[in-house]
């Protein structure tokens, strides 16, 4: 199945902004994150604009957005 | 900080001043001080621009010390924008300098009969209040440029631009940064209009010959400050995200969350958000050779600010903050960072709040004055404010006045003050704060965006009402206390996530005063401030019916989540039950 992965802030450096990936059914957010060796902890995860946990199982057509901890205001 | 300067601008024969012992206000700083004086001394039914109102300027209780991040200055009054009590704070140099001069507060009282314009100069030798009509009609940048030739290099300036002189309801008070640029503003609630009504154009603070305020227990203080800074540096938000990208790192986050108010709160997602995001902004700034990390005041270790330059490397403005990029950007359908930077400069120069001004432009777009996305049109509209045309005066009075004049229903304000860059339908926690804070819609009064969206300081579902009242209550209490210390509110991220950093701050305050401070003391301080503010607002005529969002937030679902604000009125009325 296909999922769109989006990276933000420091996670983009040396990687990508947006990438469409082919992943096997049953792939979780963790599976995607673990393969990328991101610098620092993952702070915020959205799947289709809703907050998700690392164990969340992705579905075909999902958009996964991954942020480090960021803040401002 | 053992004295208070009171300047009677309305005294017969011209302004007079007196320096009093701090007396009953001893130990208070920042918001605790401004709120205590306003609530005790200002008639709640007074006209905010009349002689009965007072403008109180107070450094934080830790300002002027070696404590990192302690450079916030609070300004308080009865707000001409909201009609309630107001505390608006800013960075820049003023807090540190005023605190070293030993003043716990400056109180501007009365108003002159004549049309003369005044400046107030304060240094170690005393106070000078003088007429300077050559400053009339000067915007903030040329004003500070003209003044700084006349004073010591160490001076800090608090000024009003043309908007303040015109007493526009969104007028700000500018504070100069370490490079003496008028870039840090007490923006919210029209404090600049109150200073303008008192005919004070500039306050010049010079701490030449003075030293940092010494702590009672220097060794403990130094150790606590070290642990405090360590905590800020190791937290990913204050140690990495903010220095690298500034506050605008939030554009992509809120847009991904579907909570980014777009085209005057019509949708929660802006298709061109990426173009004005912090990531793109930082890349552009580095490419153009601007200064990539910069502190708004000396002693800041987060350094979230930046100097924004144009394609030729020429100074435009300080890095527009997230709320400004949103207000003038996505909120108006504008996706050009250079346009937004120009608008930020114009706001700072004329001296208006970027949020209420951006929201007013969004409402004007809704009314059809110019289309959404029209950057050149937005610049023209904001230039009208500087010119003082009838249209400019309307816009410079903020979103609510603009909505009334142009017959717009969708006006995102509470108690007359514009909301910030988070839609309260898709971040319900911030909706509770917007609705109930004493300040009018103010995201900083209880930043529930942290636990709702950023997953800092807790974890709540932003699309559900559960837990939001309690979270907003606790944050409003904590914020009122932090706003009294002079500390930048960004310390709240590590404070809430790292108990040892919170303890370091308690130890630092304790060591400064030679006391032992606990978390309960902080909570008690926060509650006492909110209680005074609520009491003032009640006496000014506010009821629970003012603690509500505009009805369209309850009636119009916002895409992409198609939700309305779901916290009930009964629950909103529980925020201050503790």
Regions found by a protein language model. Give the residues of each.
Chain A
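Ubiquitin-like/PB1-type beta-grasp interaction modules and other compact soluble beta-rich domains
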Residues: 1-72
